[in-house]
Design a protein with these regions (language model features):
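Conserved acidic donor-binding segment of nucleotide-sugar-dependent glycosyltransferases
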Residues: 232-242, 250-255
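Acidic anion/phosphate-binding donor-loop and adjacent secondary structure
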Residues: 78, 93-110
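Conserved donor-binding/catalytic core segment of Leloir-type glycosyltransferases
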Residues: 115-131, 140
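Aromatic "clamp/platform" in nucleotide-sugar-dependent glycosyltransferases that forms part
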Residues: 200
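Glycosyltransferase donor-sugar binding loop
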Residues: 124, 149-162
Length: 288
């Protein structure tokens, strides 16, 4: 017997599940289903986004609802007063191939004429403004450590708009590397040392897990649900947290601690690999 699933928006885990023989996706988009209100509810509902009327019906009628953070789980429990056992948290899945890591780094440093002992601080996001690009540049401007470069990557539109703001950051003029529409964004995580995301957004920033998986030290505003996977040292009290520049200086000056945190982050992020998340999901549905 197949387990049925439904979702608002797809993700890596859902796309993998679609290929399993024991999984069937329920769709209620057909004309006649809407006309006769012949709606089916899935065994498992993947919730994302706002808790609207449609989502509430799916949650109440499913056997299990999957969310990507405890913050969302707690909000659902508070508003709907349903059993905690019916809401399961599976953090976003990571599916990155880190083979040839050294070659990728060497090629990148050569391409952009970077000394091999230079540290790289990375920023990327779908929406630069709400993800804290201004705060990112302000923090980097306040660093005392000097031997670093900044990678800022996005689409052509975002990079083009950003260039109008850069003249005010004279101190960073020789340090900024702008990259638009890079062929493989995952490689930018692999070559970087620090991923700094002073975001204003609440929705789980999957890039934090990607960065951790790729052995970056991460810093993140606690406004974001991804705060659940980082420790106190990596947490920013707000996107404008003035202590972060001191923390970055300290970690860049301590090579041993830098490497230690990178390895710890990689170990933690591996728990969210697509293989581990598939295993966890299949264990959950075996109890339905």
């Amino acid at each position: 017997m197949k387990t049925t699933i439904s979702y608002k928006t797809t993700n890596i885990l859902i796309e993998k599940l679609k290929k399993q023989e024991n999984i069937e996706v329920i769709s209620n988009k057909g004309f006649f289903k809407k006309l006769f209100n012949n709606k089916k509810y899935a065994d498992v509902y993947f919730h994302s986004g706002s808790l609207d009327e449609k989502s509430i019906k799916n949650i109440k009628n499913s056997k299990i609802t999957i969310v990507n953070s405890f913050s969302i789980k707690n909000k659902i429990l508070e508003e709907l007063k349903i059993s905690s056992e019916r809401i399961e948290v599976i953090y976003p899945s990571i599916n990155i191939n880190i083979e040839n890591e050294d070659t990728i780094k060497i090629d990148f440093y050569k391409k952009f004429n970077i000394d091999f002992d230079t540290k790289l601080i990375f920023f990327t996001a779908k929406n630069f403004k709400t993800s804290g690009i201004k705060e990112f540049l302000d923090i980097c401007s306040n660093l005392n450590y000097s031997n670093f470069k900044i990678i800022i990557a996005g689409d052509k539109r975002q990079i083009g708009s950003l260039q109008f703001s850069l003249p005010k950051y004279k101190k960073l003029e020789e340090k900024i590397i702008l990259i638009d529409d890079y062929k493989n964004f995952d490689e930018l995580f692999l070559v970087s040392d620090i991923f700094l995301l002073p975001t204003h957004n609440k929705s789980f920033a999957t890039n934090i897990l990607k960065a951790m998986f790729c052995k970056c030290v991460v810093f993140l505003s606690i406004k974001n649900d991804a705060k659940e996977v980082i420790d106190v040292f990596a947490s920013m009290s707000s996107p404008t947290d003035v202590t972060i520049a001191f923390k970055i200086d300290a970690i860049l000056l301590d090579e041993k601690e830098l490497e230690n945190i990178k390895e710890q982050n990689n170990k933690l992020a591996k728990e969210c690999s697509i293989e581990n998340n598939l295993k966890r999901f299949n264990e959950e549905i075996s109890n339905i």
